Design a protein with these regions (language model features):
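PAPS-dependent sulfotransferase catalytic domain
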Residues: 1-56, 68-75, 80
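PAPS-dependent sulfotransferases, especially Golgi type II membrane carbohydrate sulfotransferases
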Residues: 49-192
Length: 192
């Protein structure tokens, strides 16, 4: 499933050993969408390049880019480089409150570093302990997929996608349990 791959990749791409020895930054989509006139100059400065007007346009090699037609936002503002549909999407569209709790806990260090959450180490440690047994169970979004595809839950739990996601979730949990963070986590771009 595409969603499983995206979760797995995100959990690992925010914490790569390449960030430890190379100069790398992360840029919040919200900063780019809501404050392009501050964010793009900050990116240019960090990269050591000149700010150009074309950076504010949806172009690729000088040609107009019409957006990704596979995006759920394509018909709304998919052709607007600074459209806000993607950052204003209703929470809960895919993940239940239970799913969100687990993912929010696993992404906690990233969320704190990038300013999405306030630091609360004691609550984080409590939540981390609480989610460990939950990682061995199906997420609600997985139950929905199984129901829609008419796959028996026991069979679903033997599937490659289920086992792949679990291996990543448990590895990330183990790292957080040991370090209380991701040791090689990406740092955010500082915008003045």
């Amino acid at each position: 499933s595409d969603i499983v791959t995206k979760i797995f990749q995100m959990l690992f791409e925010i914490d790569s050993s390449i960030y430890k020895n190379h100069t790398s930054i992360g840029i919040k989509l919200e900063d780019l969408k809501e404050r392009p006139k501050k964010t793009i100059p900050a990116i240019c400065s960090w990269l050591g390049i000149e700010e150009e007007e074309s950076l504010y346009e949806m172009t690729a090699q000088g040609k107009k880019w019409w957006g990704d037609p596979t995006s759920p936002d394509y018909t709304v503002d998919g052709m607007n480089p600074f459209g806000k549909t993607s950052i204003n999407r209703k929470v809960g569209l895919v993940f239940s409150k239970n799913d969100q709790f687990i993912l929010r806990t696993l992404f906690y260090p990233f969320s704190v570093r990038f300013g999405y959450a306030k630091e609360n180490p004691d609550q984080f440690k409590t939540d981390l302990k609480k989610i460990r047994p939950m990682l061995d169970q199906m997420f609600d979004f997985e139950k929905n997929i199984a129901a829609k595809t008419r796959v028996d839950m026991a069979e679903f739990m033997k599937s490659g996608y289920y086992l792949y996601l679990r291996s990543g979730l448990i590895e990330r949990w183990t790292t957080l349990s040991k370090f209380n963070t991701y040791p090689n986590m990406l740092k955010p771009l500082r915008i003045k």
